[in-house]
């Protein structure tokens, strides 16, 4: 695998750290007036999802992580695994709860997801940026109730709970940003 010098470190670069793939989220290159230059890096381990900071000397290097991001279609959940299919090869992959994590609440049938593979096994699943889900439970909105500028909690068809405006009712389909978990709009 490729080896990266500290000068090559950029946000989004995937490297091996302690035998586990990690992605660089922030990188700051520091050249002090006296002494050797170094890179202060913030990383997120892809398997354990831990955030950590590490300092690399300018002479250090890191091995590139052999991970692949591929687009797969979400099929179904059998209770233990979430199943995805490659639309080109029709090959199916099963991701466990550790790989899916909190994103399980945004997975809907036939959604295009980005799945990160390491050693041909899924280690991370990223749902589409926006999903359209039906509201299955929320408090009824009262006409003229504009005293609070906030919203009300609504339970969606996948079990996720988001804050929605007061005018949104049960049975309506809304668009949700999966990155922040916030209401975006009603779907016409």
Curated annotation (Swiss-Prot):
GO BP: peptide biosynthetic process
Gene Ontology CC annotations of this record: cytoplasm
Q: Spell out the subcellular localization from the entry.
A: Cytoplasm
Taking the first listed entry, what is the main subcellular location of this protein, grouped into a coarse class? cytoplasm
Q: Which InterPro entries match?
A: Elong-fact-P_C, NA-bd_OB-fold, Rib_uL2_dom2, Transl_elong_fac_P/YeiP, Transl_elong_KOW-like, Transl_elong_P/YeiP_cen, Transl_elong_P/YeiP_CS, Transl_elongation_fac_P
Q: Does the keyword Manganese apply?
A: no
The protein's PTM annotation reads:
May be beta-lysylated on the epsilon-amino group of Lys-34 by the combined action of EpmA and EpmB, and then hydroxylated on the C5 position of the same residue by EpmC (if this protein is present). Lysylation is critical for the stimulatory effect of EF-P on peptide-bond formation. The lysylation moiety may extend toward the peptidyltransferase center and stabilize the terminal 3-CCA end of the tRNA. Hydroxylation of the C5 position on Lys-34 may allow additional potential stabilizing hydrogen-bond interactions with the P-tRNA.
Cite the CDD domains for this sequence.
Answer: S1_EF-P_repeat_1 (cd04470), S1_EF-P_repeat_2 (cd05794)
Where N6-(3,6-diaminohexanoyl)-5-hydroxylysine occurs, the residues are 34
The molecular function terms of the Gene Ontology recorded here are: translation elongation factor activity
Pathway membership: Protein biosynthesis; polypeptide chain elongation
Q: Does the keyword Iron apply?
A: no
| Family named by the database record | Belongs to the elongation factor P family.
Output the PANTHER family linked to this UniProt entry: ELONGATION FACTOR P, ELONGATION FACTOR P (EF-P) FAMILY PROTEIN
Function, in words = Involved in peptide bond synthesis. Alleviates ribosome stalling that occurs when 3 or more consecutive Pro residues or the sequence PPG is present in a protein, possibly by augmenting the peptidyl transferase activity of the ribosome. Modification of Lys-34 is required for alleviation.
UniProt protein name: Elongation factor P
The scientific name of the source species is: Proteus mirabilis (strain HI4320)
Question: Highest lineage ranks of the organism?
Answer: Bacteria, Pseudomonadati, Pseudomonadota, Gammaproteobacteria, Enterobacterales
Q: Which gene encodes it?
A: efp
């Amino acid at each position: 695998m490729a080896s990266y010098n500290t000068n090559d470190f950029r946000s989004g670069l995937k490297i091996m750290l302690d035998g586990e793939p990690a992605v660089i989220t922030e990188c700051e290159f520091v050249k002090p007036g006296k002494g050797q230059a170094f890179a202060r890096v913030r990383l997120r381990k892809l398997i354990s999802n831990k955030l950590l900071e590490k300092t690399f000397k300018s002479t250090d290097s890191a091995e590139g992580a052999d991970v692949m991001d591929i687009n797969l279609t979400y099929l179904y959940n059998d209770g233990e695994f979430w199943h995805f299919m490659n639309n080109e090869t029709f090959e199916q992959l099963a991701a466990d709860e550790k790989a899916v994590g909190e994103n399980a609440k945004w997975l809907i049938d036939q959604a295009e997801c980005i799945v990160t593979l390491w050693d041909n096994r899924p280690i991370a699943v990223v749902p589409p940026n926006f999903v359209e889900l039906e509201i299955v439970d929320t408090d009824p909105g009262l006409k003229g109730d504009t005293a609070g500028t906030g919203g009300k909690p609504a339970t969606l068809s996948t079990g996720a709970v988001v804050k929605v405006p007061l005018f949104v009712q049960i049975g309506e389909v809304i668009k949700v940003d999966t990155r922040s978990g916030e209401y975006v709009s009603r779907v016409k």
